[in-house]
């Protein structure tokens, strides 16, 4: 990932591999070949291992991440409910955890999300997920990057 600056507008250049998944402004895009794209306008996007599938949200920290992801890249009508769900899940996790460090991280994630900086909130939530994985002894999530491409629809 690199940024290049033009006269007035900054662009973001991403190199994506075959099979990579990217969500831009709520629209999922799967790349069939290796490609390089340039985002020339502000967009809400995640790609590769940043994207969590709904069925992977199977622990408290992962549910927080998924709710924040929805608040960030969901369709317009999903973003508000995603943020509300994240608030509730963060509150519940903060009440249940004995770790002051995790409480502080969750508080920062909530503040970032409420300040419309869901990308930063997601980065913090990933740290909470790693902590949870270590404490519970569960494996980290696999990357969706190499999921097989679906067969094209007939017709």
Model regions: which residues?
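Terminal leader/tail segments of proteins
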Residues: 1-155
